[in-house]
Amino acid sequence: MSLNRRILLASPLILTIALAVAANAQAKDPKQIVIGTSAGPYADQVRLGIKPILEKQGYKVRIVEFNDYIQPNFALAEGALDANVFQHVTYLDRFAAQHKLALSELVKVPTAPIAIYSRRHKSLDAVNGGSTVALPNDPTNQARALVMLDQLGWIKLRPGIDPIRASERDVAANPKGIRLLPLEAAQLPRSLQDADYAFVNGNYALASGLKLRDAQRTEKISPAYANLVAVRTPDRDKPFARDLAAAYKSRAFLDVTNKHFADYAKTDYQLALQSPGAR
């Protein structure tokens, strides 16, 4: 989620055409919702769980998949999308402030955690001087990885720092002698061919064929890193936004989550639905 405008899409032209078609269709049909997602599980959540619910209410749902963390917010702000699903509130707030975009959280979604994977080693105990550790290069997700490295004892962060804003500059000691390799989030699964260990965001891990149960250490997701649906701020109370939020909060979507996304961190409203006595 680097906050520059580098686009990692295989074909920007195809995306441009897709967005143009989506925007045009939306102008003709107010019951169409165009949702941008990162490629992989969050697109699958919409496809398997949210789209069927909304279609029963008369909506036409179009999904546009992205392979980077930059363009979905610009596309939303510019009106090519009605909503997007790929980011947590820490990233959304930072990105919106930096680029002066009026975007807001609508509802949290079940989230796949960032985790450490390795194809070279069977356990974290194999770390040694010179081990290469790939991690996200965007500020918010890099901070998550650094905090986990500090918890493992591989590095030591400066006392008193804000963990949400931790950066490589805050590494006070490196007792294991590891070499940090910051990469674009989408490149992290491929880095497992060469790196000893890699922190991979949940959506990219699953999209690349990695399984959450194969991770050697998994983050315990805090509210700051739970993924969400974002909309343009003026649209938060529009009928489509209320219906979209209600779909995510429905028992039907909880059933889809339990069937297809059982290893994900559930939202508070899903946990409430599962509690004894909930109807």
What are these regions (language model features)?
Residues 106-156, 254:
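A conserved helix-loop-strand patch within extracytoplasmic ligand-binding domains
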Residues 94-106, 119-121, 192-194, 199, ...:
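Ligand-binding "clamshell"
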Residues 77-87, 131, 154, 176-178, ...:
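Alpha-to-beta junction loops
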Residues 113-124, 226-240:
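A bilobed periplasmic-binding-protein/Venus flytrap-type ligand-binding module shared by bacterial periplasmic
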Residues 30-50, 67-71:
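Extracytoplasmic "Venus flytrap"
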Residues 63-74, 161-190:
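Short helix-initiation/N-cap motifs at beta->coil->alpha
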Residues 69-100, 115, 122, 207-209:
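Pocket-flanking alpha-helical
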Residues 143-150, 248-268:
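Periplasmic-binding protein-like
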